[in-house]
Regions:
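C-terminal beta-signal and adjacent terminal beta-strands/loops
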Residues: 38, 638, 662-722
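N-terminal periplasmic accessory domains that precede
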Residues: 80-83, 98, 150-173, 186
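Short acidic/polar hinge/loop motifs at secondary-structure boundaries
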Residues: 114-142, 188
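A beta-strand signature from Gram-negative outer-membrane beta-barrel systems
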Residues: 131-166, 721
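Transmembrane beta-barrel wall of Gram-negative outer-membrane proteins
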Residues: 178-215, 227-274, 294-311, 315-317, ...
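Face-selective signature of the C-terminal outer-membrane beta-barrel domain
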Residues: 246-268, 292-446, 450-452, 458, ...
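Outer-membrane beta-barrel signature, preferentially recognizing the C-terminal barrel domain
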Residues: 298, 352, 408-411, 454, ...
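Gram-negative outer-membrane beta-barrel transporters
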Residues: 536-539, 557-644
């Protein structure tokens, strides 16, 4: 439900565009005020009978958690993604993205009752389905399904395929102060069917999610007594074209046989440049000019496929995934004095190649109605190859290489699991899974001594249940044993040219293991009004955090046990019941705490950078009798400090993020939307405390604080279909 599900599209400040935005808001608000002056009875009658400019009535209340296509007509959706986002109280989760393998449930989206293939992004998959092809969307409970790992709310999108060629497109021009406009951000999707009915379906997407951004900032440096001794005025710009293409194929060669193939390729051509003037305050000396740059020419290829067919009294399914990523990057930094000239420069180059291959087989059968079994086996291979080189240039010298270093990190993994789903009564459903994982983790310095592989055997599994108190109130509980997914870059050393906060390699790193528990209460009050609260906790062993290595090394490693707990609230409030037709308020609020013993000083603290509080409140008004909609949002994310060997960092925003939007749903058949972000003019901040040695032995040397001023951001969007 959040309006921030897609990357923000930054834009700027044309006065006529901004005035047009607020003019639309004023007109829409005037219509709203006039409508609010009517009696409640009249408003309720309008909610049932009045047709808007789109010729659609206010959405009827869904029956039996099924949302027919006409429920969404008021919003004039273009894709299935637009429809799912308007389901009260529902949140899309990506599931396996960033998790270990394919056997942990996946995204909470089904298409015609089927799980998405491999690690397919549900946002991309839904955006490729035309809204007019959607028959209905039914909210189901994961514990009642025969899909291992799914729990909580699951959206099952029923799609009616068609042979006709259809397409959707969107264009998102971006404008922003002091930056060139970004005019190429957009997406085009073509879909249809070839051959006889039920034959080959296809969806082809071409897109560019490129962005440009920039800010000006002033950084202050103070000594241990709080005395300002240096200021730094910085101006930076960055951006990245992200062209890509995706192809999705579905094939039904004969009844009960299904095949899917998804392939996606995209580039990420990032560049960043920053110029700063460093001015001493308490000491004599010249200003220093610094220049830093970063670039990356990344390409990504993702492919996944599956084939499902009946065997004996059950169904056998094979799934394959291939991910490849190449990421050559560079970082540079130089210092110059206006009086004495060049002072020094450095450059750090890195070439990284990442590979993931997964194969999985699942066999499922149902011996009786409502009782499902599945046995699964999965194998995976992950690998990271990295080559790095540091270059230095001193006054009067040339750029000289400091030696090439190379690393390889790989993991072979196999797992097997047995999953069972069944009702335990007319109101209680249960799903349980037990499994075991074997993995072999190896790391090596290709330019130095080899490191032998380490082998692990770990249990995995979960128990998930749903108790249906009545037709509108569900209680869900889940207990899971999870093995974490490592970031292979954490094994590898890294160089920080600007701040001199380098990372040491650590080949002893192992995945964390966790016991996860949650209880969720989900209440539907009718007419689209929902409230859901989830309480959760985790006990983590082999916690991945920052650890000391040797006498002065700072690396990513394992620090023992940690605890994490919190609650999440998601609620939708529709205004129709209170005489405000077409209005809705969506609320998300998360609170979290965590505890781990600091590896240097032993005191309890939060996990590094862990979430503390996050909220997102979105208001929307689809004005009855018109094609206009308007609204806005406020949101914020507050995270904990990050502890390193010689420093403590914290970053965030000094107030809530804010936005206003106005939308017209039918301008010559197109949907036009203007959104003004950062209405309150917030600034991002970064704070750092540096010590003159390790935190356990040194004292505070200095504190640093910087604030980035981005200004207002205006985004335009034009959407159409054919």
């Amino acid at each position: 439900m959040s309006i921030f599900n897609r990357p923000l599209l930054a834009a700027t400040g044309s006065p006529c565009l901004i005035s047009g935005l607020f003019a639309g808001l004023i007109v829409s608000q005037a219509v709203s005020v006039t409508a609010a002056a009517q009696t409640v009875d009249t408003l309720q009658a309008d909610a049932r009978t009045t047709e808007g400019g789109t010729g659609q009535t206010v959405p009827p209340a869904p029956a039996d958690n099924a949302y027919p296509a006409d429920y969404f007509a008021l919003y004039v959706p273009r894709t299935a993604l637009d429809m799912v986002r308007r389901i009260p109280g529902f949140q899309i989760t990506r599931g396996d993205t960033g998790r270990r393998g394919l056997g942990q449930g996946g995204a909470n989206i089904l298409i015609n009752g089927e799980r998405l293939t491999g690690k397919t992004d549900p946002f991309d998959q839904l955006s490729q389905i035309q809204a007019e092809s959607v028959v209905e969307i039914r909210i189901r409970d994961g514990a009642t399904l025969s899909i291992p790992g799914l729990s909580g709310q699951v959206a099952d999108v029923t799609v009616e395929r068609t042979r006709a060629l259809k397409g959707t497109w969107e264009w998102n021009p971006q404008f922003r102060r002091r930056l060139e406009p970004n005019l190429t951000n957009g997406e085009l999707t073509l879909s249809g069917e070839l051959g006889e009915a039920g034959g080959l379906t296809y969806a082809l997407t071409l897109r560019d999610y490129g962005f440009r951004s920039g800010a000006r900032a002033t950084e202050t440096l103070r000594n241990a007594d709080g005395v300002l001794f240096e200021t730094r005025d910085e101006d930076f710009q960055n951006g990245a074209p992200q062209p890509g293409a995706a192809l999705n194929l579905g094939w039904t060669p004969r009844p009960d046989h299904k095949a899917n193939l998804n392939a996606e390729y995209w580039q990420f051509n990032f560049s960043r440049s920053a110029r700063a003037v460093r001015t001493p305050v308490t000491s004599a000396g010249d200003d220093t000019l610094t220049f830093s740059g970063r670039g990356e020419d990344e390409w990504n290829l993702e492919m996944d496929a599956d084939y499902e067919f009946p065997v004996l009294s059950g169904t056998l399914k094979f799934i394959g995934v291939l991910d490849r990523e190449s990421s050559p990057t560079f970082n540079s930094f130089s210092r110059t004095s206006p009086r004495t000239g060049f002072l020094g420069a450095s450059r750090f180059d890195q070439e990284a190649e990442e590979t993931e291959v997964i194969g999985r087989a699942e066999y499922g059968w149902s011996p009786s109605e409502g009782r499902d079994w599945q046995i699964a086996a999965e194998g995976a291979f992950n690998e990271l190859d990295v080559e790095q080189q540091l270059f230095l240039r001193r006054p009067g010298g040339v750029l000289e290489g400091q030696g090439l270093s190379a690393f390889n990190v790989s993991e072979d993994r196999a797992e097997a699991s047995l999953t069972h789903s069944r009702p335990l009564g007319p109101r209680l459903d249960l799903q349980a899974s037990a499994g075991v994982e074997y993995s072999s983790l190896s790391q090596s310095r290709l330019t130095g001594p080899q490191t032998e592989a380490r082998e692990f055997v770990r249990p995995k599994g979960f128990v998930s249940s749903t108790y249906k108190v009545d037709d509108s109130f569900d209680i869900r509980a889940r207990l899971e044993r999870e093995v974490g997914q490592l970031n292979f870059f954490d094994f590898v050393a890294a160089v920080d040219l600007e701040d001199n906060l380098n990372r040491t390699s650590n080949f002893d790193l192992v995945p964390s293991q966790s016991w996860l528990g949650s209880v969720e209460f989900d209440k539907d009050f009718g007419d689209g009004n929902t409230f859901r609260i989830e309480f959760y906790g985790a006990v983590i062993s082999d916690t991945v955090d920052r650890i000391p290595v040797g006498t002065d090394g700072d690396a990513v490693g394992n620090i023992g046990k940690a605890h994490r707990y919190g609650f999440d609230i998601v609620s939708t409030i529709k205004g129709d019941r209170w005489g405000l037709p077409g209005t809705e308020l969506n609320i998300e609020f998360d609170w979290r705490d965590s505890s781990v013993d600091d590896p240097l000083l032993g005191f309890p603290r939060r996990l590094n950078g862990d979430k503390e509080i996050a909220y997102d409140v979105e208001y929307r008004h689809d004005v009855t009798g018109t094609d206009w909609a308007y609204g806005g949002s406020v949101s914020r994310f507050i995270s904990a400090e990050r502890f390193r060997l010689f420093s403590i960092d914290r970053n965030g925003v000094d107030g809530p993020n804010s936005s206003l939007f106005v939308e017209h749903k039918d301008v010559a058949g197109l949907t036009l939307r203007a959104t003004l972000f950062n209405v309150l003019g917030n600034e991002e901040f970064f704070e750092r405390t540096r010590f003159d040695g390790r935190r356990d032995a040194g004292i505070v040397r200095q504190t640093e604080e910087i604030k980035y001023n981005f200004g207002p951001i205006l985004s335009l969007s034009v959407e159409g279909s054919f």
